[in-house]
């Protein structure tokens, strides 16, 4: 396809191996170092891109405190080959933070406010716990139930509303681990994982080029034996059907179509459309439905046009209703999360948006698809979606 000068193209994508937050490979690596390593390596393998041309580093991160505080985008950027004259900002849309980072860069390119951007995100949930420093306003309860801020309970609600059974959730969780393990064994993650040093379970320093979060030994019987994690009386959502708490970072090099043509770069894909949407916080996980419908309408497409979908697996009880109402549940094995998802790989909040987008592009490249959708729910009731076309 021919590019327009202000088209937004993805030049490359990379991510760290996903590490367990409790005693995992990244336990002695800071979030800024993880981010800087990733940015540096991605720029090294794209030597046609001059770091001096980077307009802005836009980095997603949710819990912006401790080592993730004080604008981690700038902290990480200063430790790379990107010069001090390039800017950097940290953004948060909770779970959708690094996809919002991509959207922010895309909007700048579309409006002529820069040509080259580095986007992505990080979350070290082992060093900065999910609730560290969080102090919700009690007055919020006048507008939204307190349970609406408890993501597991919103998944329980959504699953119950849509008649999702415990067995369906367990099957979905099993599928995630099986597909992620298959992708690992077949080398499907090779292009996206940028190796980095970490510590194994015995404390030895080694180079990791694989995700330590995947559990190939997972069985349906094992998942069925787990107790409900959020609603002990009558709940169906378990640790085995929820996204893992993990550490990781993801990164993309994004530029205008004109600059890519000038540099003789063959991009991976072009952004066709973007959208965000809000839903009732009580059904937080339903957000991808309206955001995807909106994005498809903006692109002049329908779901039938889409070859592959990456949906962040916050919870099986959340993902299944979304796929049902997007009319792709019966096509799941052909189109959706073909390399597994967050149940197997984990959901480091600030990292996940760029991670699922990049994984989608690799799935499209490996399977010959043309159009893809990356979408995710966002805590407190939002959805965010990007539609890509492979070049």
Curated annotation (Swiss-Prot):
Main localisation: cytoplasm
Record: active site: 95, 347, 377
UniProt EC number: 2.3.1.16
A single MF term (Gene Ontology): acetyl-CoA C-acyltransferase activity
InterPro entries in alphabetical order: FadA (IPR012805), Thiolase (IPR002155), Thiolase-like (IPR016039), Thiolase-like_sf_Thiolase (IPR050215), Thiolase_acyl_enz_int_AS (IPR020615), Thiolase_C (IPR020617), Thiolase_CS (IPR020613), Thiolase_N (IPR020616)
Complex formation: Heterotetramer of two alpha chains (FadB) and two beta chains (FadA).
General function of this protein: Catalyzes the final step of fatty acid oxidation in which acetyl-CoA is released and the CoA ester of a fatty acid two carbons shorter is formed.
The name this protein goes by in its record: 3-ketoacyl-CoA thiolase
The encoding gene: fadA
